[in-house]
């Protein structure tokens, strides 16, 4: 994803529904999130210098949010042909190296990123 300005927060906006593959190649359905008090969706990728700069803090924040029954979900929307560092195997490595405690999902065709109006990485959405 290119470097762009994210749109302003739209309070009260309904979260777009999605089904994406996780790192175990299993489907993750957003309809199964109703038992949480909050949802943090963040669009990240492995190669982005901005993501690399905040990843440790992001992982710690996701752990802290669990205490408040808030689930964090990472979505990787990049074209893995153009950015091989973001491919599925490298997503697994990135997740392991950084001790992700949250789902890391792949959005192969950027359909979900478009539904969220995500325009860059990292890009954050709270519900």
Question: What kind of feature is each model-predicted range?
Answer:
Residues 92-126:
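Short, internal strand/loop/helix patches
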Residues 1-31:
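N-terminal "domain-start" segment that seeds a small globular fold
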Residues 30-54, 58:
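Short active-site neighborhood of thiol/selenol oxidoreductases, capturing the structured segment around
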Residues 53-96, 112:
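Structural microenvironment flanking redox-active thiols in thiol-disulfide oxidoreductases
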Residues 37-38, 68-70, 100-102:
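Loop/turn elements at helix/coil->beta-strand transitions in domains of secreted/extracellular proteins
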Residues 15-16, 39, 121-122:
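Short loop/turn microsegments at loop-to-beta-strand junctions
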């Amino acid at each position: 994803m290119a470097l762009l300005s994210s749109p302003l927060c739209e309070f009260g906006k309904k979260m777009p529904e999605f089904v994406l593959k996780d790192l175990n190649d299993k489907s993750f359905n957003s309809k199964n999130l109703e038992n949480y008090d909050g949802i943090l969706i963040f669009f990240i990728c492995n190669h982005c210098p901005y993501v690399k700069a905040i990843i440790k803090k992001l992982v710690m924040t996701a752990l802290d949010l669990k205490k408040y029954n808030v689930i964090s979900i990472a979505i990787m929307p990049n074209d893995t042909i153009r950015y091989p560092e973001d491919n599925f195997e490298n997503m697994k490595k990135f997740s392991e190296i950084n001790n992700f405690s949250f789902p890391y999902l792949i959005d192969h065709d950027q359909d979900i990123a478009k539904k969220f109006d995500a325009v860059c990485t990292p890009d954050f959405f709270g519900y």
